[in-house]
């Protein structure tokens, strides 16, 4: 028996809008790459990004399919996000590289050259 995906609107999508919330409650929506494994979504970003700061303060997020530029392609779904320990990042990097290929490798290389510290978000259905 196959279990239905908890994120059906994100099936076969390349980008999703991730909406996080400032301490004031104001939403901030950002288009991001993601990988889905079972009932979880994984996102790569930089440790000093606004997304990470906002998730650290409030793990309630919303996700929806979108274009590369963030134009919504479907309904928004509530979810819960948390920051993964850095040692779990290799697995997430592999998932994202499998999905996005050379472009993901280039982005990771440039980030490493800049001395950026990566951060990885795990997102589950709310």
Where are these regions (language model features)?
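Short, basic/aromatic recognition patches
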Residues: 1-16
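Short helix-to-loop capping/linker segments positioned immediately adjacent to catalytic or ligand/cofactor-binding
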Residues: 5, 20-24, 106-111
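Short beta-strand segments
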Residues: 13-47, 62-65, 74-78
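Generic, ordered loop/turn and secondary-structure boundary motif
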Residues: 8-11, 29, 53
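Short flexible/disordered coil segments
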Residues: 2-5, 29-35, 81-86, 126
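A general marker of short, structured functional hotspots
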Residues: 3, 17, 30, 38-40, ...
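Short, structured beta-strand-loop surface elements
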Residues: 48-120, 124
């Amino acid at each position: 028996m196959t279990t239905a995906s908890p994120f059906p609107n994100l099936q076969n999508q390349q980008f999703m809008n991730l909406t996080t919330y400032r301490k004031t409650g104001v939403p901030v929506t950002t288009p991001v790459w993601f990988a889905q494994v079972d009932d979880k979504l994984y996102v790569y970003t930089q440790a000093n990004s606004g997304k990470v700061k906002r998730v650290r303060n409030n793990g309630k997020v919303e996700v929806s399919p979108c274009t590369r530029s963030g134009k919504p392609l479907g309904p928004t779904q509530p979810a819960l996000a948390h920051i993964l320990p850095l040692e779990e990042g290799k697995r997430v990097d592999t998932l994202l590289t499998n999905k996005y290929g050379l472009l993901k490798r280039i982005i990771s290389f440039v980030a490493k050259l800049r001395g950026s510290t990566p951060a990885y978000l795990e997102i589950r259905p709310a």
